[in-house]
Amino acid sequence: MMTAPKPSYSCACFYTDNIFIQEFHVHVRYTGEQQFRRDYERVLSSQGCRTSEQFRNVLETIKKEVERRRKLGEESLHRRREISLHYKPLYPEVYVLQESFLAAEFLTAVKYSKSPQANVEGLLHHLHSITDKRIYRLPVFIPEFCAKLVEELENFERSDLPKGRPNTMNNYGILLNELGFVDALTAPLCEKYIEPLTSLLFPDWGGGCLDSHRAFVVKYALQEDLDLSCHYDNAEVTLNVSLGKEFTDGNLYFSDMKEVPVNERTYAEVEHITGQGILHRGQHVHGALPISSGERWNLILWMRASDVRNKCCPMCDNEPVLVKTLGDGDGFTSVREDREQTVDICTLT
């Protein structure tokens, strides 16, 4: 007998908080126009939003983004159906993880992390630590796989099938769950290969109990997104893998964890190397400098641990108010419905 799929949840803050105003490089919270004017009119003015028309445009942008988020699950399911019915993959083999796709150094690190004597000190011999910020570089994919994956994504990009934004800040890229990559590619990558590493590197951030993930690819090009402002991820642990192609500049930069005051943060710049991944805590503030030529593609895995986020939402830093959603949700679970606070998305105002 088939079991019903588990319900998916987001935190209610997803519909009000961390709304990015790209023109003025600021994240805002919006519960209504009166609150927004009170909290952000002066901030936006200092960023260059000084006319009534500019402010009205900002409000319109926010309202459109809130509406997009409300419809996200429904529209994502629609896109998945359309893609599964009408898209013909260029390279079907890249949808199913094979060890031949993975770099030898990565496999060695994973093998060590699964051994009975494994510890974090020993694992660090197989990784490159970037300063003392608990940011790690490691080879993940061979270049040939990266090239094929990008060709597959470009093939989909050229199709007239519907496409969703990869996240709330990037405008260009692809949601890998909608294209069918998750079950046989990114899920086994996370469960079989990455979690043994994160269980040693980030035990205090749920690295040993990651139970869901969000997978997407972001694209940077001269006439599209050039850079990415400072932010933190809706994840306990993030893996960012460079897929190529040819480009100049566009390095990542990391400061400190989000609770560190801005005036006390220090920065480290990190170069992209095709096939190599950067592994870091999701709450580590980071961004990307502008590219100056070419195209840059990166695979992003936001890995979630419900044991961690069920206690404290990483985006609002409060106990999550759970909202049932269509689609995949944001990694929250409600094991005991009678003890968890839940609301219906339709009741949010």
UniProtKB/Swiss-Prot annotation:
Q: Where does 2-oxoglutarate bind?
A: R296
Please provide the record's keywords in A-Z order: Dioxygenase, Iron, Metal-binding, Oxidoreductase, Vitamin C
- Pinpoint the Fe2OG dioxygenase domain residues: 211-305
What is the E.C. number? 1.14.11.-
Entry-linked InterPro entries: Oxoglu/Fe-dep_dioxygenase_dom, Pro_4_hyd_alph
The Swiss-Prot or TrEMBL record annotates one GO molecular function as: L-ascorbic acid binding
Q: What is this protein called?
A: 2-oxoglutarate and iron-dependent oxygenase domain-containing protein 2
Q: Which gene encodes it?
A: ogfod2
